[in-house]
């Protein structure tokens, strides 16, 4: 025990231990909070690629990960991570995806109207579908729709098969979706004049 600790009866050591305990407790709380936040979301890794950068001393190898994250209830985001290890690249992609969250308008588990998304050479067509149809989508478009919580949809990729282009085209299409109330307000009409009767019945059944 140091002279200072002897003079104050060992209180300094006790205070230090208490301080360390509080700091460890805060770190554990933050870690648990992050784990809980992660558990709330659906996470899908679309692609992982290895890339090489040629430098003076040779080649620097790294990995890229295209990640989709959503809550399954209308929120979804896409992120692109790059790191020297695969887990780190996936983590960076997931963090970026959470920053890019946006809401997808849906009625009874399907999108509100037909839409076509484009990005570079990627073209994705999406149409509403009847209950029980399921997610009719292939390739990189399916993870985006599933993470968003879309249950019934008809979609088709009409352009490039590149995963990044397809994902971005799907996101572009979903961002074009508008709620019937917005269309009615824009046109100065009632909801019944704008939205099909079948859609209104679906919404009434969903809210009941």
Curated annotation (Swiss-Prot):
**Record domain S5 DRBM: where:** 41-104
Give the record's keywords alphabetically: Ribonucleoprotein, Ribosomal protein, RNA-binding, rRNA-binding
Q: What are the transmembrane regions? A: none
Q: Where is the composition biased (Basic and acidic residues)?
A: 1-21
A cellular component term, taken from the record's GO annotations: small ribosomal subunit
BP GO terms, sorted: translation
Q: Name one Pfam family in it.
A: Ribosomal_S5_C
Locate the region Disordered: 1-38
Q: Name one GO molecular function term.
A: structural constituent of ribosome
The UniProt entry, under InterPro entries, shows: Ribosomal_Su5_D2-typ_SF, Ribosomal_uS5, Ribosomal_uS5_bac-type, Ribosomal_uS5_C, Ribosomal_uS5_N, Ribosomal_uS5_N_CS, Ribsml_uS5_D2-typ_fold_subgr
Q: Which family does it belong to?
A: Belongs to the universal ribosomal protein uS5 family.
Quaternary structure (record): Part of the 30S ribosomal subunit. Contacts proteins S4 and S8.
What is recorded about the protein's domains? Answer: The N-terminal domain interacts with the head of the 30S subunit; the C-terminal domain interacts with the body and contacts protein S4. The interaction surface between S4 and S5 is involved in control of translational fidelity.
Protein purpose? With S4 and S12 plays an important role in translational accuracy.
Q: What is this protein called?
A: Small ribosomal subunit protein uS5
């Amino acid at each position: 025990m140091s002279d200072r600790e002897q003079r104050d009866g060992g209180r300094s050591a006790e205070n230090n231990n208490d301080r360390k305990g509080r700091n460890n407790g805060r770190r554990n709380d933050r870690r648990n909070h992050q784990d809980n936040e992660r558990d709330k979301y659906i996470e899908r890794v679309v692609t992982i690629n290895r890339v090489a950068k040629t430098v003076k001393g040779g080649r620097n190898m790294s990995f890229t990960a295209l990640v989709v994250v959503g809550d399954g209830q209308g929120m979804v985001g896409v992120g692109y991570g790059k790191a020297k290890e695969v887990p780190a690249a996936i983590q960076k992609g997931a963090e970026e995806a959470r920053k890019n969250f946006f809401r997808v308008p849906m009625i009874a588990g399907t999108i509100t109207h037909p839409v076509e998304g484009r990005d570079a050479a990627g073209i994705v067509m999406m149409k509403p579908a009847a209950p029980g149809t399921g997610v009719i989508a292939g390739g990189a478009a399916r993870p985006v729709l599933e993470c968003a919580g879309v249950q019934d949809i008809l979609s088709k990729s009409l352009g490039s098969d590149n995963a990044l282009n397809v994902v971005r085209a799907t996101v572009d299409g979903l961002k074009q979706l508008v709620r019937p109330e917005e269309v009615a307000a824009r046109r100065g009409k009632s909801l019944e004049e704008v939205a099909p009767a079948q859609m209104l019945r679906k919404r009434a059944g969903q809210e009941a």
